[in-house]
Amino acid sequence: MPDAEDVRRIALSLPDTTEKTAWSMPTFRVAGKMFATLPEDETSIAVRCPKEERDELALAEPEKFWIADHEAQFAWVRVRLAALEGEDELRDILADSWRQAATPRLLEAYPRLGLPPAG
């Protein structure tokens, strides 16, 4: 099961990522835009996720994903670390969120992390 140190290590391994404390918790940012937070209890993370996809995830896997009341109007979802299958799943979730916050220049510079090709 991934833990808070895995979140920090993986998030900071993504290009141009910085850590900044906000609301008394670690947040991870790319180009100044937040893409992940690690709430104080360190049992979950919040990540960017398009609202439609977020709603589907929360319905399909409520033991893993949920929408915090104070984040309902935003395109964010909570993820229970204990419910993840391992570091690979955590890495995929953090990379997906990073892509949503990264600049087009970063997406072009890191095609492995960039958006999937059209077609």
Model feature map: region roles:
Residues 1-119:
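Charge-dense, helix-prone N-terminal extensions
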